[in-house]
Amino acid sequence: MVVGPPALRELVDLAGYRFGAGGEPPEAEVAPIRERLPVASPQEAAVLGNRDLFGGLATTAMLPGMEQICAQWRPDVVLRDPCEYASAVVAPALGIPTAQVAISLAVTEAGSITAAAPALQRHRTGLVDEIRASPYLTAFPVSLDPSSFPTTVRFHEPGTPNRTPVRDWWAGSDAPLVYLTFGTVLGHMSIAAGVYRTALKAMERQDVRVLLTVGRRFDRTTLGPIPPNVHVEAWVDQRDVLAEADLVVCHGGSGTAFGALAAGLPLVVVPLFADQFDNGRRVADASAGLTVETGQGDALSRRQVVGDEDAPRIAEAIQTVLATTSFRRHARRIAAEMAATPTVDDVLDTVLLGGVD
């Protein structure tokens, strides 16, 4: 069973899993935090996102539903998003073991717990220590993501045999395929249209095929003219695209960046805020791609503004990575490291359930 806010029901249903509805905080309380995050200092952003939103508003909203579901369904184990804390409050009190499943670098996840601690400790003395001590499952490679969690278990997701080929939106062109995405969060923000327009400008004279995803809530009419080599979709199955792409251009979100590396693909990272700078730096340090710093903002402030004047830098980085085979070679080296870890099924059986089928 997957437990989450009601908005996740459709996605979970499509995946074929049972869904349990928890609560979510009112949009009127969440929207000001979401808009403030890209321009907040690192210290303020940590408080806003981790203490106020995840540790406070989201946990409070999720607790009633989580308590009811865990008490009635009695799962053998709860696998939790590291920033979903209601299950960490409820499950241990019922004798149900929990484990964190990483969505970011371990140093980021550890920092999130520290920032959320003032809100979490109101629920139970020792809760923060319990969370830190619980098994930490991650698909990220140790070479790029050392972990301070005492029980860190690395795994990989095996490829799906039922992949859907990417449709030919480019009239039979065999030019390199570039997957361009800035994740699911950007589309909710007021800066989204400007970022997408800059990325499109960087693509307009490139000899590449471009598949851009913008999210289901983004108004595509704000993009302006679309270059003929670019096709825009709200959403695609990332695994399908990565199986055919030659390059990923993205914001450096963990799911996209490490998904690309797992597929052996080099990256051009244009970080915007939060942990995207850390992810981009690690990609560049591993020689698996390039990170583009724009003319406004800086990595120390963990935010940057992307404008039209940055399009040439992005275009140059794309040309460099596509023309330099060593980037792909290093990406494939990281992919091999990730593939050498146990499968997620093996991890669940041997680590969490003690070998129970």
Predicted regions, residues:
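Metal/cofactor- and membrane transport-associated sequence elements
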Residues: 106
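Alpha-helix C-terminal capping segments
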Residues: 124, 170-173, 200-206, 351
